[in-house]
Amino acid sequence: SYVLSGAAMNVCSNEEELKRFLQLAANVSEDHPVVVSKFVEHAKEIEFDAVAREGEILAYAISEHIEFAGVHSGDATIQFPPQKLYVETVRRVKRVSRQIAHALHINGPFNIQYMARENDILVIECNLRASRSFPFVSKVLKINLIDLATKVMLGVPVEKPSKNLFDLDYVGIKASQFSFNRLQKADPVLGVDMSSTGEVGCLGDDTASALLKSMLSVGQRIPEKTILLSTGSAKQKAEMLEAAKTLQKHGYQLFATGGTSRYLSENGIENTLVYWPSEEGKHPQALEMLHNKQIDMVVN
């Protein structure tokens, strides 16, 4: 890693932002270089935690981030075993990980972070140490990877664990705890800079049950009756459609901003149109409803 916790990292969407962030970096220090790399959008992030002995992998765990790559791994929601990875993606991750372990002659714990789009994978970084997801995957697998890694580093003979991550009949979710409500002027939007102040691990029969347990454990609450939907591209609207139908089926009152409201109506989903602050004189206003606590949950 170049930095810890994503400190001093920024994502630029245009040339103007790039110039501004480079100027900020120069103001801090003109003597040190700035690392610039391409930001891959809408990619899935994958964690590969493993223990190797003299370059041979003895045990491993592959987990997937629920959020797109670009959210710091300390803030991301992680599920293990992976539920939505292509078989070919898993095969490539295992192959590349074996090659890296062999090339670096790794003897102990290590973590590799990958990005995947379709079946193309890219290595974000390889850390020759245990990661924050090591304790989580160890508990889910019921294999103490740190104990195994310690014995390997001390030269104590060990046997290769026989348990396979695809043999598990349950799903684990690692969710992050945030303290935005207690921090004045905190920005609750997640990004490359780590913001979480803790985390929980939960097990369930499937992703949905484990995820619900984890969200409740970190202080989230189930919306009672009103949900505001506001999506961007046509692709995002299409991806949200089935979920919106499910919410309506369960009796939730749906509010939506302009384009989202039209899309829902065209697909037979009843909703109430709300307006942005820029649309003066029109009601109901989205921000007013939020300030008056008339909305229980926002999906944006």
Question: Which residues does each predicted region cover?
Answer:
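ATP-dependent carboxylate activation and anion-phosphoryl transfer catalytic cores
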Residues: 1-223
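Short internal beta-strands
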Residues: 228, 251-264
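Short glycine/threonine-rich loop-to-helix capping motif typified by GTGT followed
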Residues: 116-128, 236-243, 266-267
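Glycine- and Gly-Pro-enriched alpha-helical subdomains that act as flexible
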Residues: 220, 224-226, 231-252
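A general structural motif
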Residues: 207-213, 231-235, 254-256, 275-285
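Short gly/pro/ser/thr-enriched loop/turn and capping motifs at secondary-structure boundaries
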Residues: 3-4, 67-69, 260-263, 279-282
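Glycine-rich, anion-gripping cofactor-binding loops and their flanking helix/strand elements
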Residues: 266-300
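Receiver (REC) domain switch-region micro-motif
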Residues: 36, 227, 298
